Amino acid sequence: MEMPKDYNIEIEKQIQKKWEESKIYKFDEESNKPPYIIDTPPPYPTGRLHLGHALNWTYMDIIARYKRMKGFNVLFPQGWDCHGLPTEVKVEEIHGITKSDVDRHKFRELCIELTKENIEKMRRQIKSLGISIDWDKEYITMTPEYIKKSQTAFVRMYKDGLIYRGKFPVNWCPRCQTAIAFAEVEYKERESKLNYIKFPAADGEGHLLIATTRPELMAACVAILVHPEDERYKHLIGKEFIVPLFGHKVKLLADEDVEKEFGTGAVMVCTFGDKTDVLWVNRHKLEIKKAIDEKGELTEIAGKYKGLKTEEAREKIIEDLKKEGYLVKQEPIKQNVGVCWRCKTPIEIIVTEQWFVNVRKLIPKVREVADEIKWIPEHMKIRLLNWIEDMDWDWVISRQRIFATPIPVWYCPKCGNVVVAKEEDLPIDPTKTGYVCDKCGNKDLIPETDVLDTWMDSSITPMVITKWLDDDKFFEKHYPVQLRPQGHDIIRTWAFYTIVKSVALTGKKPWDEIVINGMVFGEDGHKMSKSRGNVVEPDEIIAKYGADALRLWASNSVVGDDVQFLWKEVDYGYRFLRKSWNACRFAKMHISDDIIDELKKPMEISNPIDLWILSKLQRLIERVDKDLENYRFNTIVEIYKFVWHEFCDNYIEMVKYRLYGDDEEAKKEARWTLYYVIDKVVRLLCPFAPHFSDYIAEIYKIDNLHFSFPEVDNRFINEEAEKFGEIAKNTVISIRRFKANSGMALNAPLKYVEIYTEDEETYLALNKTAEDIKGTLKIEELKIIKGKPALESKIVEIIPDKSKIGPEFKKNAKAVMDLIKNADEETLEKIINEGLETEYGVIRKEHIKDVKRALFCEGEEVDSVDIEGVLAMAIIRK
């Protein structure tokens, strides 16, 4: 089979089609091979695969392909985490409606329809990357089958006392109008004002100055706190003060958590400004007042400010405080504000009835399980442990939305019973299906309209892919799974919640190992965003350079680190593939299809250059194997170095003379080595550039590519061959460079070359590889000589500087120039060092424009070449 002249990225589509039709990556449930199961992250179906996805999926695919080649039965599924607010918002935007305009179930159908479209788009993009997924193992969280499992997890955890309903402070997004978990709160720095406000004493004697950034919460102020050791306020503890503008009285209390140095050291406690307020309210058993409602507007306790959004209310209250003389001063301040991770709206803390997972009860076991899991890189575990240590709230799992897994619960208005669905009735939507109270028999129950947090769906993925609830035998055999790959940005959500659910439902760890990838930044070094204009789409890269070049860019990074996208690195990967293609094409000109079967058989190799490349190849195989075992994907750099520099630039150049020569045995050995190296390199490349590898394997009839990783052949590990080969390689490189610098063609013949060395090992190496050096460099006669060359530097020509001699010596200028031209070494030295007294005047070094010298050996003019990295010198006779 002939190879086309140029590497064409269009072959990738043909190869992807071949893989899909053959189902080559299908997980074999009957196989006796050891299983390797990857808990693939299910992306949110936005309809667009971004570069961060491409990085993560490349990492996963390298692992999957490597493990398959190492003899594992790999289960590499694809999931879709469908539910969530962004889809609801998009549906409202597309159809020009709000979710309250249409029937709840109709709205859900519109969300499902959009999600299906988006999944199809992203499925195509994942396939275009060449990801070796078993598409028969795809799961979608909005399907009845998945919802049943999500609801079953809820029911079982409720029965075990790990899920409860209660009225507690929760993080609330006014834009999304739903509760959110602490893990979904991001923090953004913003400029604000610290307002110093007078609180008059209730007895009329003076006032207390407090500092706050949130005067809009003053209507819900329930106390003022100071540090018990603060000398400024010790005598005032227990005294009452009046909240300005709102008129109600609050007590001054002592608490050791107050920072004396912040503001005035006196802080107002409101329900609720932040987490600390919640802590203080519980600790001091303070009254709870609802300052802000679910829409982010002030409530009736705010009086004339009722109905105002927080920002607007803040402005008006500050204005009134100024008018009334309560505002003393304002200072600029930078503060970290909690915002919703989806819409970036500042969150509020409000008291509502919600469903919670009692994560605090599970923390000791979660910590224990986290230690059982191998974290790559290891320091990423600290992020999870720090998150656990700081956790003082339970996980709020109810959401006030529509497009999500329904909470399978009803409420009995007669007896107050909370009715939870039986497992055999799942999946179930309480808003569509009635139920009977198991206490009083009432059939007229109130359905729960809240839905589950999407993390409640995605936190059971390792259980779902191992057939939890469907096949007990399969589940027991395959759970926990081997690997979870994910981003560091969701350690405190997806990783944490998955461990929580696994501990709660199975008592086991969910996976043996977790590999963490970083974020992708733009060429400008900033996070990719449309507003910055630094977004690069995977489709754009694939269209220009192909999927394999994109994969090579992704591979050349360190697990856990953030990665900067650079077009030049993609281009480098593409040029590497073209270079490799050209090398394979050259080799194929000498390896016809009819001799390939013979080349697959073992062969005794004696040529030192063949032995050199074969030994170097074994080192590469060993290195790449070890690196991939430890998730060091940037081992691709080692493959680059070997293929580009050792194989293409050097070995192929050094083997050409044999391939084009008349020695059939030498030719046969060269062909065998070429085929062997290409076979092994293609296999090493396969996890990184599978399309390229597959196509070369087809051309070269390489067997079992996707299921056989190369093994080190100890027969070919030969330290002496490596040393000798390096000496020969450096000799060839140095003399080829001499040819290029001398304006000679690289294939121009050299009549006679002597290589001198005083080093014994170098002398042996040069003698051993002399025929290859001679043949590669087209040297007619080559001598390897032990010792030093008797070199002598002689003047060939001295060029006078006419521009300086003429004006100075005038009519004697010609005589001076003749004297300079004919100067011997002694005369030249005198001119240069001290000046030469003549009848015409003093001749100095500035009168000489140039001195041309030549090397002579045994009376014959020669060129000399210092051989880079080798204790040797080549003498080239002219």
Curated annotation (Swiss-Prot):
It is an enzyme of class 6 (ligase). It is found in: Cytoplasm. The keyword Ligase applies. It comes from the Archaea. Its EC number is 6.1.1.9. It catalyses: tRNA(Val) + L-valine + ATP = L-valyl-tRNA(Val) + AMP + diphosphate. GO terms for cellular component: cytosol. ATP binds at residue 530. GO terms for molecular function: aminoacyl-tRNA deacylase activity; ATP binding; valine-tRNA ligase activity. ValRS has two distinct active sites: one for aminoacylation and one for editing. The misactivated threonine is translocated from the active site to the editing site. Belongs to the class-I aminoacyl-tRNA synthetase family. ValS type 2 subfamily. Catalyzes the attachment of valine to tRNA(Val). As ValRS can inadvertently accommodate and process structurally similar amino acids such as threonine, to avoid such errors, it has a 'posttransfer' editing activity that hydrolyzes mischarged Thr-tRNA(Val) in a tRNA-dependent manner. This is Valine--tRNA ligase. The gene is valS.
